[in-house]
């Protein structure tokens, strides 16, 4: 008898609202910088959500879509709430709970390393795993990587979300500026920078490709002008 099967069936049962609410709250926290319930793993009756109706609606939608997490992310990310500006006003500058403006948040260690790999065109090799494995796909904490450790990837010693420390520190700044993670990838002979130099494309094309690879958008006119001036020097 596989006891995991009835457990999974109970967790995902439409009658078990706790699981759907917990998953929904976590994804709100990951995408919005703050969950409807905070801390995001402290789901209890004495810690009510900031917007109970929204949590209930998203949870019911998750159940209706058979716990399709991609659909949940799509629902959140195509909402007006997710697309609000991060610029605050005099009226909402102090708001940290009700999503009156988008909350700027730091990218966690794993997707940050994956983003660097994408921007530079050089994949990180993890021990005993095939080249091309993303940091976000690591099965457990038994794959040491200095960058991930420096940027607070948790050791998964507990189930508490508090194990991942969101605060910046000096070691992260120094490693970004002087460490070998970025420097090695930028200088890689098979990386994006080397390929752009070898292709002999214009400065404008170089800037456009790097912006798209790093930020998933084209540079603005002012950014393009400033970057062209820098490359011309």
Model regions and ranges:
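Primarily short, surface-exposed interaction patches in extracytoplasmic proteins
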Residues: 1-128, 154-164, 183-233
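Generic structural signal for residues positioned in beta-strands
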Residues: 6, 98, 115, 134-137, ...
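Long, His/Glu/Asp-enriched segments that create or flank divalent metal/ion-associated functional microenvironments
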Residues: 120-123, 127-129, 136-137, 141, ...
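Amphipathic alpha-helical surface "interface" segments used
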Residues: 134-142, 194-200
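Structured, non-catalytic alpha/beta "coupling" segments that mediate domain-domain communication
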Residues: 168, 176-186
